Amino acid sequence: MPNIKSAIKRVKTNEKRRAQNAAQKSALRTAVKHFETAAANGDVEKAQAAFVEASKKLDKAATKGLIHKNAASRQKSRLAKKLNGLSA
C-alpha cells in the first residue's frame, strides 16, 4: 500500500476507472451479443434495433479509448454485413 498521499489517490482513482471500464466493456459485449442472437433468430426488426445500440456503444467505447477506433470500426462493419445479409 502506498504511503504518499498522491499515490494513495492514484490507487483509488485507478480502481474506480477500472470498474467503470469493465462495466462499459461488459455492456458493449452484451449489446453485440443481443445483435448476434437477433440475427441468428432471423428477426430483422430486433436485429436492426440491436445494431443501432451496439454501434452507439462501440463508438462511445472508441471515443473513450476503451477500444481502438479501428477495432470499433471493424466490429461495426462485420455487424452491418450480417444485418445486410438478413435483409437481402
Curated annotation (Swiss-Prot):
Recorded GO molecular functions are: small ribosomal subunit rRNA binding; structural constituent of ribosome
Which InterPro entries does this UniProt record tie to the protein? Ribosomal_bS20 (IPR002583), Ribosomal_bS20_sf (IPR036510)
Name the GO cellular-component terms. Answer: cytosol; small ribosomal subunit
| Ranges where the record places region Disordered | 1-22, 69-88
GO process annotations (BP): translation
**Entry keyword set:** Ribonucleoprotein, Ribosomal protein, RNA-binding, rRNA-binding
Q: Which Gene3D superfamilies match?
A: Ribosomal protein S20 (1.20.58.110)
Signal peptide position in this chain? Answer: none
Q: Its domain of life?
A: Bacteria
Q: Which family does it belong to?
A: Belongs to the bacterial ribosomal protein bS20 family.
Its biological purpose:
Binds directly to 16S ribosomal RNA.
- Which protein, by its recorded name, is this? Small ribosomal subunit protein bS20
Q: Which organism is it from?
A: Shouchella clausii (strain KSM-K16) (Alkalihalobacillus clausii)
Gene encoding this polypeptide?
rpsT
